[in-house]
Structures are given as structure tokens and as C-alpha cells.
Design a protein with these regions (language model features):
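Phosphate-binding/catalytic loops
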Residues: 74, 80-139
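Conserved active-site segments centered on acidic
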Residues: 1-71, 136-139
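Helix N-cap/beta->alpha junction signal
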Residues: 5, 79-80
Length: 139
């Protein structure tokens, strides 16, 4: 929860604010693994957001919990591995709340993981496209 998911969290918050819909959404991100719990957003991800005028100050990684499934209407995964981990946390998806971000676009699949690729621009493009499409669906 230090690269893609916080990028998606803060991009979505930015899009929602620009649409004048902030009072209609509660947006957060959480980790599906434990490695980075408590750590801030990875500096290159933070810089990529800042390039677009988006701050993620004070964000630290937190662990996803079963309560997240009860609290949120939608749980959006960045890749298939996240989907599997999320299903484990929430005990399946009986309410059909879980989906991949890119499945809301014309290019379904995984969001590029910059932790491995080093390509934060490709991740930015995926996240922006996915969040824009998701917001359009939810309007």
C-alpha cells in the first residue's frame, strides 16, 4: 500500500473533488500484504502524484481488514494477486463488491506495478484511466 493503491486513492479523491462530489464518496486504500504496514507512500509514487498537483502527505500503509468489506460499497484491486488476497481477507465476495481497477476500462487486466517495472508513468496512466472510468460508472 505504498505505490499503486495510494496513487489510485489520491487520484480518485482528486477526480471526485474536481467533479464537486467529495461529499458523496469515502475513498481509502489498504494493503493486502504486511510488508509495508506503517510506511509512507514510496517516494517515486509521491513524486508522480506531485507532478500532477496531487498531495498524499501523511498517508501510511495500513492492512486491509474484514471491516473494510462491511464499510465500503466497492473494493478495487490493482491486480489479480490483490484479488486473491482480498478474497482471503473478506471471506469471499458475496455482495460482488470487489473488482480490478482496469476492468472498468476498455483495457481490462492489472495495473502496471512500478515496484517491479520502475515505470511510474505507465502506472500513472493506468491509474488515471481506471479511476476516470470508475468515476464515470458511479456517476
Amino acid at each position: 500500500n505504498i505505490c499503486r493503491s495510494p496513487m489510485a486513492e489520491f487520484v480518485m479523491k482528486d477526480l471526485v473533488a474536481k467533479a464537486g462530489l467529495s461529499d458523496k464518496f469515502e475513498i481509502a486504500s489498504a494493503a493486502t500484504s504486511t510488508e509495508e504496514i506503517g510506511n509512507p507512500v514510496y517516494p517515486p509514487a509521491r513524486r508522480k502524484l506531485a507532478e500532477h498537483g496531487i498531495s498524499c502527505e501523511d498517508k501510511t500503509a495500513r492492512q486491509m481488514t474484514r471491516r473494510d468489506y462491511e464499510t465500503y460499497d466497492y473494493l478495487i484491486a490493482m491486480d489479480h494477486n490483490n484479488l486473491r488476497n482480498m478474497a482471503r481477507f473478506v471471506g469471499g465476495d458475496p455482495e460482488h463488491k470487489v473488482s480490478l481497477l482496469m476492468d472498468h476500462t476498455r483495457r481490462p487486466g492489472d495495473v502496471a506495478d512500478p515496484w517491479y517495472t520502475g515505470d511510474f508513468e505507465a502506472t500513472w496512466q493506468d491509474v488515471l484511466e481506471g479511476c476516470t472510468a470508475l468515476l464515470e460508472e458511479l456517476r
